[in-house]
Design a protein with these regions (language model features):
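Alpha-helix boundary/N-cap detector
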Residues: 5, 9, 255, 272-275
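Short Lys/Arg-enriched alpha/beta "domain-start" segment
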Residues: 1-34
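Hydrophobic HxD+1 residue recognition
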Residues: 300
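Conserved protein kinase catalytic/activation segment
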Residues: 292, 296, 304-315
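Conserved ATP-binding subdomain of kinase catalytic cores across diverse folds
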Residues: 47, 54-265, 269, 309-311, ...
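Short secondary-structure junctions
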Residues: 26-39, 120-128
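An alpha-helical support segment within catalytic cores of ATP-dependent transferases
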Residues: 119-123, 261-296
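Short amphipathic beta-strand and strand-loop transition segments with alternating hydrophobic
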Residues: 29-43, 49-53, 284
Length: 355
């Protein structure tokens, strides 16, 4: 089979598969172009690394890049969930059934050994969740995060946690392995932290007890007030550490306004008249003291915090998935993280009240 025929056969399977995945965050009817295919394991089953470019309807949206780890076998993998199976395509060796390799234990372990050639991993399980990445637990000791949406340049989740680890900040889990190609970060491995849960789960449990028992908050065993105060202190320590690791400058109100207008335009997508909101944003340019501008988490909330032992740990520093990579890495006001966390508390309260 020539390369053009192979690419056409694979592309026909990839478009519907991508659109059905929870981690996929681009156009619902993608135009897929295969940019690279590498074989990480030959034979049956094979392990393929595939880089694809995805464009939106009629090419209007900016292209996005996704990496796929695909398995190929001579028999249909009926034991895997339907959402993990792409279908069959012809090859010189006969029909090959394609599937998400990270859903298959054998191939997921093979890929983990690609990331860490010294690893002797024997067990793997996937973590649930609707993210732009896939997380695998290895031997209940390590966490392998595989980025699905990729782009040229460092991934903030790798860049920030590596930098914070170098200065000794304890509120993040520093990488032990990073798998990259050229200048693109593709996967990161960290030690698995033992936790009591995320801030979101602990806050919801606290509110459920409060609403059901009708006792004063201080009389509830799961009261989250003290934990919330400790979490706030950890966020403050994070910002101090980020300023130390990446530097701090006086915030530019005009630049912050431009950033907010750009984000507003993406959210509104021409469906709302944003003129009055933009006028309010423009007033930032006249502010005399906007505080400091530093690297920030970018999408902070209760679900991005883990309660460990006697402290809190903050995770998932990719930033907002809808923002271009350059914007995610741009310094901003630490109040952006504070606003994200505050909004998260509101969402949790609303969810608990609705139950």
């Amino acid at each position: 089979m020539d390369s053009v025929t192979f690419a056409n056969e694979l592309t026909a399977l990839l478009a519907p598969f991508l659109a059905s995945q929870k981690w996929y965050d681009a156009a619902p009817e993608p135009e897929v172009s295969i940019r690279r295919v590498d074989t990480l394991r030959d034979g049956w089953p094979s392990l393929l690394w595939v880089l694809v470019e995805v464009r939106g309807d009629r090419g209007a949206a900016a292209p996005r890049w996704y990496q796929l780890l695909l398995g190929a076998d001579s028999e249909e993998p009926v034991e895997l969930p339907p959402a993990s199976r792409l279908g069959a395509m012809p090859t010189p060796r006969g029909p090959a059934w394609l599937f998400d390799a990270l859903a298959d234990e054998e191939l997921a372990l093979d890929f983990a050994r690609v990331v860490d050639p010294d690893g002797t991993f024997a067990a793997v399980r996937a973590l649930p969740g609707d993210h732009t990445f896939t997380s695998l637990v290895l031997d209940e000791s390590y966490l392998l995060k595989v980025f699905r949406h990729v782009y040229d340049g460092p991934n903030p989740d790798v860049e920030i946690t590596e930098a914070l680890g170098r200065i000794g900040y304890q509120g993040v889990s520093a990488p032990v392995r990073v798998w990259s190609r050229a200048t693109t970060d593709l996967a990161v491995m960290r030690r698995l932290e033992r936790t009591r849960g995320t801030g979101r789960t602990l806050a919801i449990d606290s509110l459920r007890e409060l609403f059901n028992s009708r006792r004063a908050p201080r009389d509830c065993k799961l009261d989250f007030a003290e934990e919330a105060e400790n979490l706030g202190a950890e966020v403050a320590r994070l910002h101090v550490a980020l300023a130390e690791a990446f530097g701090a400058d006086a915030a530019d109100g005009a630049e912050l306004a431009r950033d907010m207008v750009a984000q507003l335009s993406r959210v509104a997508e021409g469906r709302l008249d944003t003129a009055r909101i933009e006028a309010n944003y423009a007033r930032l340019a006249e502010a005399e003291d906007m505080g400091s501008s530093i690297r920030v988490h970018g999408s902070l909330g209760l679900d991005k915090s883990l309660r460990i032992r006697r402290s809190w740990m903050l995770v998932d520093f990719e930033g907002e998935s809808g923002r271009p990579p350059g914007e995610r890495r741009r310094p901003s006001s630490p109040l952006r993280d504070v606003a994200g966390m505050t909004r998260s508390f509101h969402h949790v309260a609303t969810e608990a009240l609705a139950e």
